[in-house]
Structures are given as structure tokens and as C-alpha cells.
């Protein structure tokens, strides 16, 4: 398969991000896997990318530090060549309610889930070669279609990123497409035990989890769907309608 350029996948060593990194490799991209710290999972993810016949590199960055986020696209380019696919998968998911929301929780979610993807998108657009087209995919959440009062700061950050996705689709057209993927109950979260996760799955229309591989299928579709921009695919077994 021809080299389609390089992909930068934030949070690319674990959970959904890892699947998306491998799918990018399957689609013909060399992959820069962003992590906060290098560990065995990061090395294993890089190995999976290389198993697809693509190059892989691991980059470290605390996305709450704007200067580090700004530099990340350039670091990926230095290792792998021009970055033509940006996948913003890294995310913070902490519980708070409006009654106990504080500045620390607000800043944690907004800096990681909203500000960092925007900073990365800006750097991506600035560095994209004039003769190339690009794609940005933001990992959102079905909650943006059905917001609730729990996980208050998290939901606000993802809802704002969904608005930004549509705004960026307009601002960066025609050379860069911008889309989102909205997971539902995909993997048991740190706030759930197996019974909690099963109960959440049972609330969906299809009564089954939206497996990480389904997120990968959505990414592969968006890579190839050259007439699609400003959209979110809710891969949530219909949870946003339940």
C-alpha cells in the first residue's frame, strides 16, 4: 500500500487510541504514537503498527502544557515526514457534578479534552504541505448528543470539542476535513465495575457494547470518505437515542 503520509494519534497506546493507531497503519500511514510516559503498552502499540509494515515512533507530551502540544506535530514530522492525519484520542474522564465542580477539575478537562486538540489542529494545519490534503478526527462521546448532569466538566469539554469540530471543518476547508467519532459503552471505565458496565450496555438500543474495533471501522471510513466533513459518527449502539 502506498504511503499516505504520517498519522499522529494522541493517547495512542491504550484502549480506543491503540486501535485507532493500528487502523491508521493498516490504512497506509506511518504512525506517531503520543503517550504521556513510555511504557510496555506504548512499545507494544508501536510493535503492532510495525507489524502492518509501517514505521512507528513514540512521542511523549503532557497535553496540558501548551508549548509541548504545539511542538508535537513538528516532532512527529521530524521522525516520519509530513503529518496528514491527526487523531485526537487522548482524554481525561473524571467524575464531577455541578455542585462540586471546581477550578482544578474544569482546567483538567478543558486543557486536555478541548484546548490541546485545538492547539494540535492549528499546528497540523500550519505544517501541512501545500500539495497535500489532511484529515483531523476528534474522539468525542455520544454524550454530546444526549448530555446529562453527571461528569459535568467532561461533558462540557467534549460538547465544546464537537462544536469546534464543525467550526474547524468550515475554517480548514477545502484541504483539511474534520470529523468526529462518538463512542458509547466501549470498554469498562475506571468508574465502573463489570456489573455497572453491563448495566450501561443494557440501556443501549442494540444491547451490546460498541467494541473498540468498531471505532477503528469508523476511522477507516472517515479516512476514505473524501466527501465527508463536519460530521460525528456515533458508534454507541444507539445509546444517544435510548
Describe every region a protein language model picked out:
Residues 81, 173-177, 229-230:
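Short, small/polar-rich loop/turn modules that mediate ligand/substrate recognition or access, typified
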Residues 29-43:
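Conserved glycine-rich Rossmann-like NAD(P)H-binding loop of the short-chain dehydrogenase/reductase
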Residues 13-15:
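Conserved glycine-rich cofactor-binding loop
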Residues 95, 135-173, 185:
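Catalytic loop of short-chain dehydrogenase/reductase
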Residues 97-98, 102-110, 200:
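Substrate-binding pocket helix/loop in short-chain dehydrogenase/reductase
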Residues 211-235, 240:
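C-terminal substrate-recognition "lid" of short-chain dehydrogenase/reductases
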Residues 89-94, 238:
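Conserved NAD(P)H cofactor-binding loop of Rossmann-fold oxidoreductase domains
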Amino acid at each position: 500500500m502506498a504511503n499516505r503520509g504520517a498519522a499522529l494519534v494522541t493517547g495512542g497506546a491504550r484502549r480506543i487510541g491503540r486501535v485507532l493507531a493500528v487502523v491508521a497503519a493498516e490504512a497506509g500511514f506511518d504512525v506517531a504514537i503520543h503517550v504521556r510516559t513510555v511504557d510496555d503498552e506504548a512499545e507494544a502499540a508501536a510493535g503492532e503498527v510495525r507489524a502492518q509494515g509501517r514505521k512507528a515512533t513514540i512521542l511523549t507530551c503532557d497535553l496540558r502544557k501548551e508549548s509541548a502540544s504545539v511542538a508535537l506535530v513538528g516532532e512527529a514530522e521530524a521522525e516520519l515526514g509530513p503529518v496528514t492525519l491527526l487523531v485526537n484520542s487522548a482524554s481525561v474522564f473524571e467524575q464531577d457534578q455541578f455542585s462540586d465542580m471546581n477550578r482544578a477539575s474544569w482546567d483538567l478537562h478543558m486543557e486536555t479534552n478541548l484546548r490541546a486538540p485545538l492547539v494540535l489542529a492549528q499546528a497540523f494545519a500550519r505544517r501541512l504541505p501545500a500539495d497535500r490534503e489532511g484529515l483531523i478526527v476528534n474522539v468525542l462521546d455520544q454524550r454530546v448528543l444526549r448530555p446529562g448532569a453527571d461528569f459535568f466538566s467532561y461533558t462540557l469539554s467534549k460538547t465544546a470539542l464537537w462544536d469546534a469540530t464543525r467550526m474547524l471543518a468550515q475554517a480548514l476547508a477545502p484541504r483539511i476535513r474534520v470529523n468526529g467519532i462518538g463512542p458509547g459503552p466501549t470498554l469498562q471505565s475506571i468508574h465502573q465495575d463489570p456489573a455497572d458496565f453491563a448495566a450501561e450496555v443494557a440501556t443501549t438500543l442494540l444491547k451490546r457494547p460498541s467494541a473498540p474495533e468498531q471505532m477503528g471501522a469508523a476511522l477507516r471510513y472517515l479516512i476514505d470518505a473524501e466527501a465527508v466533513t463536519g460530521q460525528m459518527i456515533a458508534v454507541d449502539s444507539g445509546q444517544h437515542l435510548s
